[in-house]
Amino acid sequence: MSERENLDLQNFYFRGLHPRVFLGTASDRYAGWLGQIYSEERYTDRITRRKKTVGKMSFVEEVLPVDSVEEYFQHFRVLELDFTFYRLLLEEDGRPTANYHVLQKYGQYLKKNDSVILKVPQEVCAQKMWRGGKFVENNSYLNQDIFTRQFYDPAITILGPFLTGLIFEQEYQRKKDRSSSKDLAAELDLFFGEIPQDNRYHLELRTEPYLDAPVFKVMEKHGIGQVLSHWTWLPSLGKQFAKSGRRFLNSGGQSIIRLMTPRGARYEEAYAQAHPFNRLVPSMLHPSMVEETAELMWEAIDNNIRINIVVNNRAGGNAPLVGQQIGLRFLEMGQKI
């Protein structure tokens, strides 16, 4: 085992949990993790402060520089970068966007055995997008050319072997707006049949009725992994997995669990409770989430699956402390097996 692959949960070193376990977080660079993941003295006078409006409330976010990812990967084996969800990497005419340059900067600090998961831009995944104060139809929805040319190709060029997963997240569909699961399955079948074949694709559907046989059949056909998401309007992780017959569908032998928010809690509510992300919020952290995550980790291992656990601050206030709880429960279960 290399020096980086050590295990010390008290000090948030998770890389040595298990060869098939990749525990990490959704986004990084949070100043709230100083003293846990990041060394305080290293970032003196290097913290950027920016305002963020969430719902009707305004918050100040404190963000570390990109080179902090070197320290991040001393603790975690995988990082999900969410900023790619909000903008493509290339403009239509091929010019690099700001996101391209940020991702390129991340790539400069990655080392052997570091692993990055990217969220595919909403311009490709979302049926509707927020424009001019309202949701409007997304004309680029499941556009294979935009996905390939303006995101996939440059992402691979920038990250190379460090890119180990791509998440297609589709927003929750209200009943009056949603199509049938058969129609969605047909759309997905066409899309995944046209884009480059790749065993790193994973699909997160936030509408429970879409966790249905026609959709899972298409996912299995194309080797698309089912993202199990602990999120506002979705059933428990175990129930989501049961809907697919407890099958690991990704052709690359991977699975992704995303711990986003407490079930039943809206984004705005969870963000306000968790901010500034420097402590555990017991009222947010559901014991069942920790329990089910640990159970699924062992189930994946028993099936020779690489399991990626992505923890968001909004799942319990502070992602490293939530990860600590998961790691402890995982090890406890291992002693009983």
Q: Where is each model-derived feature located?
A:
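Residues lining hydrophobic/aromatic ligand-binding pockets adjacent to catalytic sites
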Residues: 1-337
